Amino acid sequence: MDYGKTLNLPVTDFPMRGNLPEREPEILAYWQKIDLYRKVQQKNEGRPKFILHDGPPYANGDIHMGHVLNKVLKDMIVKFKSMDGYDAPYVPGWDTHGLPIEQRAIKDLGINRKEISPLEFRAKCREYAEKYARIQKEQFKRLGVRGDWENPYLTLMPHYEAKQIEIFGEMAKKGYIYKGLKPVYWCPVCETALAEAEIEYAEKKSPSIYVRFKVVEGKGKVPEDAYLVIWTTTPWTLPANVAIAVHPEFTYALVKTEKGDYVVAEGLVQQFFEATKLTGEIVARFKGEELLGVVTRHPFIERESPVVLADYVTLESGTGLVHTAPGHGTEDFETGKKYNLPVLSPVNHQGVFTEGAGKYAGMKIDDGNKAITQDLEASGDLLAMSFIKHSYPHCWRCKNPVIFRATEQWFASIDGFREQALKEIEKVEWIPAWGKDRIYNMVRDRGDWCISRQRTWGVPIPIFYCEACGKEIITDESIKAVSDLFRVEGSDAWWKYEAGEILPDGFRCPHCGGVKFRKETDIMDVWFDSGSSHAAVLEQPEYWPDLRWPADLYLEGSDQHRGWFNSSLSTAVATRGMAPYKAVLTHGFLVDEKGRKMSKSLGNVVDPLKVIKELGADILRLWVASADYRSDLAISNNILKQTAEGYRKIRNTIRFLLGNLYDYDHEKHRVPYERLLEIDRWALAKLHRLIARVVRAYRDYEFHVVFHAVHNFCTVDMSAIYLDIIKDRLYVELPDSEKRRSAQTVLYEILDSLLRLLTPILAFTTEEAYRHFPAKGKKESVQLLDMPKVEERYLDLTLEETWDKILEVRAKVLKALEIARQEKLIGHSLDAWVTLKASGELYDFLVERVNMWPEIFIVSQVDIQNEEVTGENGELPLEVVVNKALGEKCQRCWMYSPEVGLDPEFPDTCPRCAGVLHELKNRPL
């Protein structure tokens, strides 16, 4: 007889293989068809709000793994919150202005921005930005990210730009916006000023030179045939030198050498000798403050260079005397203000010397470096020259070195609201906690924010100039006129209309009454664009009615402490007096298995679009959940293979659960808790411990804890223990026996909870499995369910402690069975008869459960003997003996029994199976 047909073997259409690349798009189409985002919003209406405000990625190119990490983290949080009692809308956004998009538009569309009108150029940039916002939108959706994709925000939207103008106006009204001549980071390639957040540091090779300045007024301290020696790595800034700075507290030495007398810091004399190959002795010493007022002559320009005092001078390198050019450095500029020094910056927007540099006019900076050092060598003023490699600021877009250049720019004065910003930082929850110190120090130490850019693709600085008196005009009236116009026509209107057409009829200059005006030509820094998003998106309910201010959470990479978190904090504190976020979470960056950064040259870049095609989006989502995002995250094809293996184990567990519920109706067949078998109650306790741990981890944003807890539950508690033990009961017992229904009751609870717990991570797989789940009154999507709740009555500590001991016994038996298998004594564990030898409490414990052990060990027979056994090294005092099982093998359940063959109708079965077969035979078909 074919007994296979009499067993309750698993039945499910849920496939073993995920085949995610083919299956996921069909699920996506289903979500779109039912308008899942709106359904979730309707379900959660009236619940407390949780607003995760999306930091806008650049609408520039296809998505990369950094995007995946960021967007999936956000999606997991939003999905969890919407299943944990919150109304958690998610409005995605894009940053659409600025240099990156200008450069790509120029390159991809083959245009020259200097040969077409600003409006034409802006139209091309808009076309490029909108195209990539559309492309990225589809790519983010393909990742399973749920959001209001039909109503996202783009920083180029007219209503967004209008709100940004209002923010600028509020800051100006409070006196935080000013125009000033200051040294700013300047990219000669991109021809624009840059903010600190647009700077990257990279290694650069620079000349390292020692230059002498002849003393012309020694103040009775320094002989007038002596020289002061400076050290610099930027010879090109020497034409702008107007002073030499010394530290007031340092001791300086007059050193007599074979080539003249030189003044350097006493602590750097030896270093000076080594660099210049000079020898000599110290003949005099003086404090830095005594040198104030000493005057030197510039080595190649007819100009004096006096000594000034500055606390930032160090003894780390050089000579302790600092070449000071207020037009080329922030500290130099502050010193220049203190001593009323001229601000010279004889370098134009392309990094070419102007007439102010004398004979070097027309040269590029690098050529100037060479020419200046050659001239210094010819005049004998170059004492030493070498080359060094050092960390130097580079432009974030074109990757070229930047310069400091004094130009007239628009600034936001941080001093006006710095103290309030620091107070607000203290109120925000920073995740990880070190983020607080990082942004606190940045805000405490940062200079004023340069907000003007000499480009075209962006929001204009809404300032007018009076043609009569030349003064800047920024009033409530002018700001409102610009904001109202932009709300209707967008910022293109600034280039479309003359100043007089933008300003209200009859507008007059508030300074002189003039009636003719011109517009500012600079645009705003893109960090001002995205930094205004808290107001432009969260405070415009007519466009995004689900949102509110402030946000509960901002979540970006840790580089945004000086970027978006900082600019958002600045605009919010300046205009509203408080931070725009209650909590800020940061993640690390991507590295390969060896800890190296992703780069095309190393060939270690993982393309997410390729991974989705080959493995599926759920594998990427699981990778994000499995890694601890608080530090740098490793990604490689090998790591993704390991992730896919982890996925397979979770999927197999889900499939087993589904397969064994094919004939189960929870309403009809559910066994009350009190009547569940002990092992089933243990599994339920394990499940509810898991629920408690996972929900807590989600609330703490510890997704790697979620993954490892669920993975461990599936592979250890379930596959290796519980599911293995109950297979016999599920397959062999009568289909509707209470023993089998007891197991099924718990399998149903486990599956129901697992699908909910995994939905924020494995969005596609849980949706697919939910379709196969035999529940009554199912929702349209698993995402419309809530998180499972912990049932305290299932957390039976006494039961769990008992089972810890049972599993300790089982572990020792499994080891013995494995040895017996290796020795060819048995094949399958059911071939075994196990003898347990113990005494005392353990013997009593074993005897109490004598009928349970064969099921627990998955063996045919177990007997227990009372013998003294000592447990070595804290081991269980238990001896396990494995022998070949007694009797014949039952052809239905494969257990051995001396009673096989007693039933004449089913002579090759054990009494248990014979009883089941008789019962089945007597049932109507």
Swiss-Prot record:
Its main location: cytoplasm. One of its GO terms (cellular component) is cytosol. L-isoleucyl-5'-AMP binds at E556. A motif ('HIGH' region) lies at residues 57-67. It is an enzyme of class 6 (ligase). The keyword Ribosomal protein does not apply. Zn(2+) binds at C890, C893, C910, C913. Its EC number is 6.1.1.5. Keywords: Aminoacyl-tRNA synthetase, ATP-binding, Cytoplasm, Ligase, Metal-binding, Nucleotide-binding, Protein biosynthesis, Zinc. It is found in: Cytoplasm. Binds 1 zinc ion per subunit. Pfam families: Anticodon_1, tRNA-synt_1, zf-FPG_IleRS. It catalyses: tRNA(Ile) + L-isoleucine + ATP = L-isoleucyl-tRNA(Ile) + AMP + diphosphate. SUPFAM superfamilies: Anticodon-binding domain of a subclass of class I aminoacyl-tRNA synthetases, Nucleotidylyl transferase, ValRS/IleRS/LeuRS editing domain. GO terms for biological process: isoleucyl-tRNA aminoacylation. ATP binds at K600. NCBIfam families: ileS. Belongs to the class-I aminoacyl-tRNA synthetase family. IleS type 1 subfamily. Catalyzes the attachment of isoleucine to tRNA(Ile). As IleRS can inadvertently accommodate and process structurally similar amino acids such as valine, to avoid such errors it has two additional distinct tRNA(Ile)-dependent editing activities. One activity is designated as 'pretransfer' editing and involves the hydrolysis of activated Val-AMP. The other activity is designated 'posttransfer' editing and involves deacylation of mischarged Val-tRNA(Ile). Monomer. This is Isoleucine--tRNA ligase. The gene is ileS.
